[in-house]
Amino acid sequence: ACSAFLELHRLITQRSDELRKEELFYVLFSRLFGKYTHTSLQSRPLRSSQIKEACKYLESHASETITLDDICQRVSVSKSSLIRSFSKQLGLTPHGYLMSIRVKEAQTFLKQGIPPSLAALKSGFADQAHFSNVFNRLTGLTPGSYQNVFLKKAPSSNDSD
């Protein structure tokens, strides 16, 4: 809970993703509630069709600002149910899933020669630093390095002497 609280504090003091802030808030609240009341927040597990619907929503709105309320309203569930079931079924939080979608979109833009700063904006990242951090964490490369790998020209047959 301490590391989640510190991350939430960092996200609040910086301009960052609202979806991640909301997720951390609900995770912390659920943990604290369970610890200090000796009960846990019971949430109804989502059906796989609801998870698929949430995924489709995230995929089709990936470049937009998305909140937990948006997703929950779409699939008619509570925030705690969404986070818990999504994580259990996919191994990622809704935010983690959204970040993976955005990075895949950015990879497509980078392969097309679009500058990293523009690829970040077009794929839904609010700022270059956040984009670079997430991209590096998920791919192991910086956006510029990734682009260089894909934009290197293959040697032509005329170059071999």
Can you annotate each of these PLM segments?
Residues 1-6, 18:
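Aromatic/histidine-rich interaction motifs
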